[in-house]
């Protein structure tokens, strides 16, 4: 019987025989994810009605969730679908007693849950924040890497968040449609395209590439099959191959789509604050 032998490796945080700059990637990813989380948290709470957040957003008489100039409606993806307790639409399902909560608090669990349990992001924050494993052939501060066990088995909920994330793409696509409609008091609806419309459209494309290239989605549409048979098999195979192509660059889609979500929100925030102007490129009022 062959006995497995482990190669000798120095013990201690960051100890390794590697001579390359292995730490640059987890450090850069840690900074990137940290900035994204802090920004999304700040913007999400900005529209809340308690504590210091009363000085911003709705509480201060401002509205930074959507561009409403020139008769348009360009809603930030951080607040979509818009849920305002006690008001029309989805807000009618929420008790009015929760008026103090930011609309983002009701919906961000879906994208946050999907990304937080994503296979790529799990690798990223395990390395960047938990340093376990820090990198290949790099020692950890907590002994040998044991893999995802015990509490971390909860990460398997990712496959269920995937279905919600796919549905979320339709919601964001509807927001793009609304962003092409311009309304004026007492007149019919006209159509057009602004820079904000294109920003939201690109956001859907980026999120589509990330979501539809997800490992769980790839498994759901084809990974569970031993072979593709007749009677829809050709269509299923084509979908699976397309998903596989996206999956090959899943890490890039994860990084760039997250950036674009934050940029989309910042663009809308900047326009509502008067720093930028949402130019109408085609049609409009």
Q: Language-model segments: what does each one mean?
A:
Residues 1-285:
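Membrane-embedded alpha-helical bundles that constitute the cytochrome b-like, heme-associated redox core
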